[in-house]
Amino acid sequence: MKRRAWATRKVGGFVDQWTETHTGCGTPKAVGGLVQELLGQSAARQFDASTQQIEAWEESVRVVGEALSEVASRVAGARDWSVLFEYSIPRREIRPDVVILGSGFVVPIEMKVGATTYSRADWLQAEDYGKDLEDFHEETSGLVVVPVLCATAAPLSDVDLAVRPSTSRVQLVNADRLGSVLTEVHSQFGTNFPIDCDRWDQSRYRPTPGIVETALDVFGGQQVREISHAYADNLTATVDELRRVITQARERSERVVCFVTGVPGSGKTLAGLSAVHQ
């Protein structure tokens, strides 16, 4: 089966190569070899890598190399972790720049080389990586997901590893802080069982439970009025109209498609779940 990641490395081998070739100047072989592999994959996948993209890869590999060298010196078992570059999440058409497979946890990383701030758009992108892996990636089921936005030149930011429910909030780090955050993630969520990189890389697409099961989980005996205070004022009216249309379609043995529109956060999903549940 074709790999989804454009390049993968065991952390131990990657760190050894990094340590042997890194001199603090120029481009270490560990960087050059990975970038050449990424270039080969980009050509094979008909992706036109610009000069800017190549430079971003070079700097990303440098940052990750420094971070993992730090982690390997602090965390027993970290050499058995894996690092993947440009991983294509099944059917989601998005690629985290880097994914770290630790022992019991997954860290998708959005790399922003040279960025001096943590933009909301980048934050949302990192959050999407975490949600997509949790909701659609079979081999990530049961693992803790910690999405990271690494703006390499940005100021330090606080770390908050509270998990809700199995994916933490996005961690904001710069190049100097990435290694320490990975160490903290292991300290809080690490197990003694490293993730099988090949199996994870080739994971099947596994969507979230069907809408009926989700509705049952969400409502749990509650009525829409009891949990809709944060949504649109006309949510109840919307649900009532959906139910009216559904009832009419049943009575007439018709098939009907209903389209519910609204701004983000207005309660469209909740309206659909409520209509199905009731």
What are these language model-derived features?
Residues 1-212:
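Accessory nucleic-acid engagement/destabilization modules that flank
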Residues 224-237:
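Dynamic helix-loop-helix/coil hinge segments at AAA+ ATPase domain boundaries and subdomain interfaces
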Residues 218-227, 254-255:
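Short glycine/proline-rich turn/loop motifs
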Residues 236-252, 273:
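Pre-Walker A adenine-sensing motif
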Residues 269-277:
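Motif I (Walker A/P-loop) of helicase-class P-loop NTPases
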Residues 257-269:
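Walker A/P-loop nucleotide-binding motif
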